[in-house]
Regions:
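Mobile cap/lid helix-loop segments that gate and shape the active-site cleft of serine hydrolases
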Residues: 30, 46, 176-206, 212
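Short beta-strand element of the alpha/beta-hydrolase
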Residues: 61-71
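Primarily recognizes the serine-hydrolase "nucleophile elbow" in alpha/beta-hydrolase
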Residues: 117-186, 198-199
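Short beta-strand/loop motif that positions the catalytic acidic residue
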Residues: 216-218, 222
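Catalytic nucleophile-loop/oxyanion-hole region of alpha/beta-hydrolase
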Residues: 76-80, 84, 96-133, 263-266
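Conserved alpha/beta-hydrolase "acid-adjacent" motif
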Residues: 223-229
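C-terminal catalytic histidine-bearing segment of alpha/beta-hydrolase fold enzymes
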Residues: 231, 238-288
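N-terminal cap/lid segment of alpha/beta-hydrolase-fold proteins
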Residues: 19-59
Length: 288
């Protein structure tokens, strides 16, 4: 397939990686040679309940990552993050990226319920995809990191689909909001309404001992989501005795940590750190 490298490179360098054009540029250069993709698989009854799965070219059982994209809980599409699925699958990790209900058509906690349903579906079908359901990880960027971490910490949502956090070998959070009250964007008051329930939206409020291992990464140049979110969550996890690692990247912006999965943008070194984390935690037993 012919690639327009100069145009894509210019777009990726000049645009924020989380804009539509920036994501298009990053997807333009994703390679199709080292993975396969199955698209628009239904994981639930709603129109938004569709997922794509990216599979390694080799036949050995792989770890399985469910990736949650960001977009402020009101935008985003799985197709825009093909470059993430491609990077992980090319490295030998089966990857699921799903669409979920978005504001204003839906409000919290509907996108959490969709997330839990997608995880349960992925786990149930892992063997069909050549993946190991016992090596299941969650990963998200921005609002997606919020969803991934809250899903791992607040047991309510996985319980609703017959599971719990023991399903998970680990969680990766990239540029995530975990401790963000009071809201700085007015529309979030409606996304997470009523105000009496705002506390339920905060992952930091659900930290407990024996949480799944976490790798939390943040750019110190992030002007959208303060790195203090990662600092405060990591401190709370450490105080609870949980396994948590952090990496902070000087100068990296909010979108840089997602863009780093593209062949165009290999810095900061997010992908190798994710691969190292998945390999290390896959080797450890997770109690049932």
């Amino acid at each position: 397939m012919k690639r327009t490298w100069p145009i894509a490179l210019a777009l990726a360098c000049c645009l924020n990686a989380c804009t539509g054009l920036g994501l298009l540029a990053l997807n333009t250069v994703s390679t199709f040679q080292s993975y396969s993709r199955q698209s628009n698989i239904a994981y639930g009854p709603a129109a938004a309940n569709r997922l794509d799965v990216y599979l390694p070219a080799h036949g050995a059982p792989s770890a399985l990552v469910v990736f949650f994209y960001g977009g402020g809980w009101n935008s985003g599409d799985k197709a825009n993050y093909r470059f993430v699925g491609a990077a992980l699958a090319a490295a030998g990790i089966a990857t699921v990226i799903h669409n979920y209900a978005l504001y204003p058509k839906a409000r919290f906690p509907q996108f959490m319920r969709d997330a839990a349903a997608a995880v349960a579906f992925a786990r149930a079908h892992a063997h069909e995809w050549g993946a190991d359901p016992a090596r299941l990880f969650l990963m998200g960027h921005s609002a997606g990191a919020h969803i991934a971490v809250l899903l791992a910490l607040d047991q309510e949502y996985l319980h609703q689909v017959g599971g719990d956090a023991r399903w998970l070998r680990g969680v990766v959070g990239l540029s995530g909001p975990y401790d963000f009250l009071p809201f700085t964007d007015a529309y979030l008051n409606d996304v997470f309404a009523p105000s009496s329930e705002f506390y339920r939206s905060q992952p930091i409020n659900y930290v407990h001992a024996n949480a799944p291992p976490m790798l939390l990464m943040h750019g110190l140049g992030d002007k959208r989501v303060s790195p203090n979110n990662t600092r405060s969550l990591a401190a709370r996890l450490e105080a609870a005795g949980d396994d948590v690692s952090t990496r902070y990247f000087p100068g990296a912006s909010h979108g840089d940590l997602a863009a780093a999965f593209s062949p165009l943008r290999k810095q900061p070194p997010v992908l190798p750190l994710v691969l190292e984390f998945v390999a290390a935690k896959s080797a450890l037993p997770r109690g049932d």
